[in-house]
Amino acid sequence: MSSLRTADDTWDIATSVGSTAVMVAASRAAETERDEALIRDPYARLLVTGAGTGIWESVLDAKFVETVAAADAEAAAIFEHMISYQAVRTHFFDAFFTAAAEAGIRQIVILASGLDSRAYRLDWPSGTTVYEIDQPKVLEYKSATLAEHGVEPAATRREVGIDLRHDWPAALRGAGFDPSRPTAWLAEGLLMYLPADAQDRLFEQITELSAPGSRVAAETAGVQAEDRRQQMRERFERIAEKFDMTASLDIQQLIYEDPDRADVADWLDAHGWTATAVSSQQEMRRLDRWALPADLTDDDAFSNFVTAEKQS
């Protein structure tokens, strides 16, 4: 159970779940500026610097990990791993959308889109519409920030400002979504912020809205032991204090670690989809991006990347 969440909580880009989007964008920005980057997101830095979230803006400093390493080598390894994880995750789901577009899908839905910039940075075929669903203030911040810098979407982009715990299918249809057309759906960095029953309901709604040939991709929720969570919390508090950075939000307290959460691939297989799951650890090692020492490796704490296609 999450200790900082309520049944109808809301947020903007600098608070609660909204601020986690800044963390992810900071990692994308850091990755983009590497010589051998897995992904290129030219807009991530813009989105981070205007958000005012302290520690995540610090990640933009090219010397950040090196500086942290001088004080706490293990914390530096964790930060390096976090950046690499986000790069690998982004790379994986970018490829998912590229394959969907090559298969002729022209209707895209990004759930809890946060500061996702794919509508702007991917090479979408003509006729593609990207629907982004998130809290209104989060969507407003992203679109306003990019517009101020003259950045235009690479596809038709439609904002659906609504909480996923409300009637988002009706709002999506109201924005022009056509359930009779195949759709590519993405739930990236989302499921861990939903209770188990809400996760099931989300996939039920996706299934109801999906024509045959639709595709869905999701990052599953990992589970971390409480003692390890506390250890991480204390370490990051020390780092923030030592380097005079704004204390980071305790992301672990925003997450629902429900023990009865359904396995996403199994759920999809049982509801008319054909699913495949790839371990994020496996994908990170395949791309030579694993940064954690062996004593910090916990299989249950890491997510899977699931993709599936609707059969009927």
From Swiss-Prot:
GO biological processes: methylation
Keywords noted in UniProt: Methyltransferase, S-adenosyl-L-methionine, Transferase
Which Pfam families does the record associate with it?
LCM
Entry annotated with the keyword DNA repair:
no
Record: residues binding S-adenosyl-L-methionine? D134, D163, L164
Q: What is its EC number?
A: 2.1.1.-
Which InterPro entries does the entry link to? Ppm1/Ppm2/Tcmp, SAM-dependent_MTases_sf, SAM_mthyl_Trfase_ML2640-like
Keyword Kinase attached = no
Q: Which SUPFAM superfamilies match?
A: S-adenosyl-L-methionine-dependent methyltransferases (SSF53335)
Q: Which GO terms describe its molecular function?
A: methyltransferase activity
Role noted for this protein: Exhibits S-adenosyl-L-methionine-dependent methyltransferase activity.
What does the sequence similarity comment in the record state about its family? Belongs to the UPF0677 family.
Output this protein's name.
Putative S-adenosyl-L-methionine-dependent methyltransferase Mkms_0097
